């Protein structure tokens, strides 16, 4: 149920973002603050909502470039799921349409460990241990 709620929230944010030509990440973050959403990111991620919105933006941009190459989809659907964010490998799953999943890289400045590690040096990253 949580997964469905999170995906619905990201789709709502995505629709709000695409509905206004001047929408940006800070406006989407304001919309997200109105909802009670708990993201399952490690404790070393200081602002989980900001990271989720950044990953969603990367997913959207990848969807746009994917559509320009294939022009397969005519509607604007993209989503991420916090359960499929891999901090050890600095990747996340981006869902395009109902049946297209793409694994994308997280930005190099993304924290990937409790001691200040970032995705700029993936060899130093640690995996997320549930419950810790």
Swiss-Prot record:
An example of a Pfam family matching this protein is Salp15
**Entry GO terms, CC:** extracellular region
> What are the annotated glycosylation sites?
24, 36, 62, 89, 101
Top-level taxon of the source organism:
Eukaryota
Q: In which tissues is it expressed?
A: Expressed in salivary glands from feeding female ticks. Highly expressed 1 day after start of feeding, and weakly expressed at the initiation of feeding and 4 days after start of feeding.
Q: Which UniProt keywords apply?
A: Glycoprotein, Secreted, Signal
Q: Where is the signal peptide?
A: 1-18
According to its UniProt record, where is this protein located?
Secreted
The UniProt transmembrane annotation reads none
Which InterPro entries does this one have? Answer: Salp15 (IPR021971)
Q: Where is this region: CD4-binding?
A: 113-132
Induction, as annotated = By feeding.
State the family it belongs to: Belongs to the salp15 family.
Quaternary structure annotation from Swiss-Prot or TrEMBL: Interacts with host CD4. Interacts with host DC-SIGN (CD209).
Q: What does this protein do?
A: Salivary tick protein that downregulates host immune system by binding to both dendritic cells, and CD4(+) T cells. Specifically binds to the CD4 coreceptor on T cells. This interaction prevents the activation of the Src kinase, Lck, and its downstream substrate Zap-70, and results in deficient activation of PLCgamma1, the repression of calcium fluxes triggered by T-cell antigen receptor (TCR) ligation, and a subsequent reduction in interleukin-2 production.
Query: Protein name, please?
Result: Salivary protein 15 Iper-2
Organism of provenance: Ixodes persulcatus
